[in-house]
Amino acid sequence: MADPAECNIKVMCRFRPLNESEVNRGDKYVAKFQGEDTVMIASKPYAFDRVFQSSTSQEQVYNDCAKKIVKDVLEGYNGTIFAYGQTSSGKTHTMEGKLHDPEGMGIIPRIVQDIFNYIYSMDENLEFHIKVSYFEIYLDKIRDLLDVSKTNLSVHEDKNRVPYVKGCTERFVCSPDEVMDTIDEGKSNRHVAVTNMNEHSSRSHSIFLINVKQENTQTEQKLSGKLYLVDLAGSEKVSKTGAEGAVLDEAKNINKSLSALGNVISALAEGSTYVPYRDSKMTRILQDSLGGNCRTTIVICCSPSSYNESETKSTLLFGQRAKTIKNTVCVNVELTAEQWKKKYEKEKEKNKTLRNTIQWLENELNRWRNGETVPIDEQFDKEKANLEAFTADKDVAITNDKPAAAIGMAGSFTDAERRKCEEEIAKLYKQLDDKDEEINQQSQLVEKLKTQMLDQEELLASTRRDQDNMQAELNRLQAENDASKEEVKEVLQALEELAVNYDQKSQEVEDKTKEYELLSDELNQKSATLASIDAELQKLKEMTNHQKKRAAEMMASLLKDLAEIGIAVGNNDVKQPEGTGMIDEEFTVARLYISKMKSEVKTMVKRCKQLESTQTESNKKMEENEKELAACQLRISQHEAKIKSLTEYLQNVEQKKRQLEESVDSLGEELVQLRAQEKVHEMEKEHLNKVQTANEVKQAVEQQIQSHRETHQKQISSLRDEVEAKEKLITDLQDQNQKMVLEQERLRVEHERLKAVDQEKSRKLHELTVMQDRREQARQDLKGLEETVAKELQTLHNLRKLFVQDLATRVKKSAEVDSDDTGGSAAQKQKISFLENNLEQLTKVHKQLVRDNADLRCELPKLEKRLRATAERVKALESALKEAKENASRDRKRYQQEVDRIKEAVRSKNMARRGHSAQIAKPIRPGQHPAASPTHPGAVRGGGSFVQNNQPVGLRGGGGKQA
């Protein structure tokens, strides 16, 4: 870089006119202007480099703010222009304006036009490369406006510690129209919103970067300059803008970043040792523009309305602080090898002089330390030391020049050697052009392969997302199944509690029966009338014995069922109970348990059969796939061998063809010579006296022979070139075939992986089916349980009726008993009420079981529906996999056709050389999308073929606007 120089940041102030809402509100125009550099607000003056009134045109603003910076950027300096102010103060109007209106366009479109106009007027030996970037800072994230997929770019530093946005799209341009098309494309992607103060409020800070690199083709001097054109979002008061929701979040981030910018300006103005550039991504990007190597111009946009007076004062104070900041600017020069060498020699001489000075001073110091007195003429004199160093260098240079001159004289080239060197150079240039074309083709091929790889990655990601959704659905169904199991367990537990309570109540009934027997004995002793009651009691005992016998029979049937289950399961440990005093409720529980065991055993047997059939089918599929894979591998090896043999055969045929052509040529020449000799002999016989005419005929024949020879030589050379081209094409096809084989191998691996995933999902589907079968079996068990409980309740109800009738008859018979009998009737009533309470509790439990059963029946259709949806999803995934394979096959065919078409197009294009006028160099740049304006095609330097407009551009000055 050149020597640095300091310069202040230029601050321009612009006031917009009152808008319609301010006029309707009756706001006052508070700004008063004094000259062209001062404005008065509330009787306080604010001075800037330039103050623009409301009537100032866009052209005047541009001429005073930005016109000079074009020359600076093209001379190798960095430049920045950004607009600052509150919302709706005219920042976007100042920077952009109406992009395609000659009078209403702002700074950005005008500066673009001026850059190219200035280039066209410069020396034709200069070559320019111009590239542009367009990005925004939205919610403190850097978002590329030319590629909306890049939403969170990062800020890095280059080798000179200059911040830059990594990964941002760079478009190479060669005309103002292409730049404007790029701006239109980026502006359409920028975030805007409607607020109470502005219908088109910018919700982000936009930065348009123009990077200009120039090279002098004669001196090889290289300069580079960057121009940042920044449109900041305005600071907002929520009470005025009415922002809410997402707009409110945007306003918070805007105010935060502007506050960070204000802190940086304040720190630079106060000369602080620490400047908080890293508090915001915007200040990080503009670090070089604020106190660094850059010529910076700030346009502060203000509202003249009294409604916004406080915001206007804050903006003016910001501008005054920024005006005190000094930047250190220097030219961005890339030194050539010769310049680096000169600089090295200069530093070397300087270092040598300093060493001589140090040596002289050390000698003089040692003499003084040793006690000597150094005379004045021997003391150090700077001029004398420089003169001695210059004389010594001159002698060395004279000594070195003599052998160099002798070598130069001996090394002069002859004309033949010079021509030979020029021919070699031409051949090398041609090889470079061929390599450029090959590089272009390979770059396009790599780009297409990248696109295909991204498509495959997206397809893989979607498949993985579907798999995750399926897994989540399976987990949810598993959780619901577990919950249903818990509910069934709770129901069974409730039934067990009921059985225990029933046992307790039965024990209490037995105790009360004993008490009743005692009372009956007392009644028998007191009254003979109770003998009939004893007889009836005997009948009741007989009935009880009958019930016990029936219970014993039921127990025997249950034991038979247990024995059958033990034989089916393989467990023969079922033992006969010793006692026979079990009641009906215990038998009911045992019967339910036995029926459940039977159903589970049947389910297990059925599932085992299904698993065996599934395993058999899976083994068959695996064998078929292995056979198909072996056949494919065999077919691939056969094709490779066939291609190799065909290649060798083609080479042999070409060699034979060349030999035959050479023999045909030689025979043709001999035939022509024989015909010529025959013709000469005939003419000699007919015209013996015309010797002169015969000589002329002989010359004509020789000329004809020579022309035939030249024609055959040209044909031979063209055929050889064609053979070489065919061999190259065969080599390319072999490479392509190898790539297709690798691609096929990759697809085979992918197919195996997807097949494994499919098997896993089939297994999970089978598990769900088994779970559904279990749920159905549980429903059947609950149904049987419900029927059993209903039967038991009916039995209890019948017993209750019998017991009530018995008590009624006994009460009638004992109506004439004395007052001592009242205690017995009260005990009977208490027993009746106790049994009635038990009956009510059993009825409630029955109703609860019925409700639970109904809920389970309602839940069952939902689970069946989910199971069907899961099966349909699996089918959809299988069809998607099949479609993806078909698409991959079509893509491979289309890719092969495109490669063939590109080869044919490259082969058919002619080479063209650069002219003397201005030309646009567009070497191929991988990774760029086509630019928006295809109206300016350019020629490839060193290749001569035309390419698209999405490639780096080199622009030469002095020769016109386009090639």
UniProtKB/Swiss-Prot annotation:
Residue numbers of N-acetylalanine PTMs: A2
Location of region: Globular: 915-963
Range of residues in the leader sequence: none
Coiled coil: 330-913
One Gene Ontology cellular component annotation held by this UniProt entry: perinuclear region of cytoplasm
A GO term for molecular function: ATP hydrolysis activity
Keywords: Acetylation, ATP-binding, Coiled coil, Cytoplasm, Cytoskeleton, Isopeptide bond, Lysosome, Membrane, Methylation, Microtubule, Motor protein, Nucleotide-binding, Phosphoprotein, Ubl conjugation
InterPro entries named among the record's database cross-references: Kinesin-like_fam, Kinesin_motor_CS, Kinesin_motor_dom, Kinesin_motor_dom_sf, P-loop_NTPase
Binding site for ATP: G85, Q86, T87, S88, S89, G90, K91, T92
Residue positions where Omega-N-methylarginine is found in the record: R956
UniProt-annotated location(s): Cytoplasm, Cytoskeleton; Cytolytic granule membrane; Lysosome membrane
Domain of life where this protein originates: Eukaryota
Span list, region Disordered: 908-963
Start and end residues of each Kinesin motor domain: 8-325
Cross-link (Glycyl lysine isopeptide (Lys-Gly) (interchain with G-Cter in SUMO2)): K213
Domain observations: Composed of three structural domains: a large globular N-terminal domain which is responsible for the motor activity of kinesin (it hydrolyzes ATP and binds microtubule), a central alpha-helical coiled coil domain that mediates the heavy chain dimerization; and a small globular C-terminal domain which interacts with other proteins (such as the kinesin light chains), vesicles and membranous organelles.
Function according to Swiss-Prot or TrEMBL: Microtubule-dependent motor required for normal distribution of mitochondria and lysosomes. Can induce formation of neurite-like membrane protrusions in non-neuronal cells in a ZFYVE27-dependent manner. Regulates centrosome and nuclear positioning during mitotic entry. During the G2 phase of the cell cycle in a BICD2-dependent manner, antagonizes dynein function and drives the separation of nuclei and centrosomes. Required for anterograde axonal transportation of MAPK8IP3/JIP3 which is essential for MAPK8IP3/JIP3 function in axon elongation.
Complexes and interactors: Oligomer composed of two heavy chains and two light chains. Interacts with GRIP1 and PPP1R42. Interacts with SYBU. Interacts with JAKMIP1. Interacts with PLEKHM2. Interacts with ECPAS. Interacts with ZFYVE27. Found in a complex with OGT, RHOT1, RHOT2 and TRAK1. Interacts with APP (via cytoplasmic domain).
The name this protein goes by in its record: Kinesin-1 heavy chain
Species annotation: Rattus norvegicus (Rat)
Gene: Kif5b
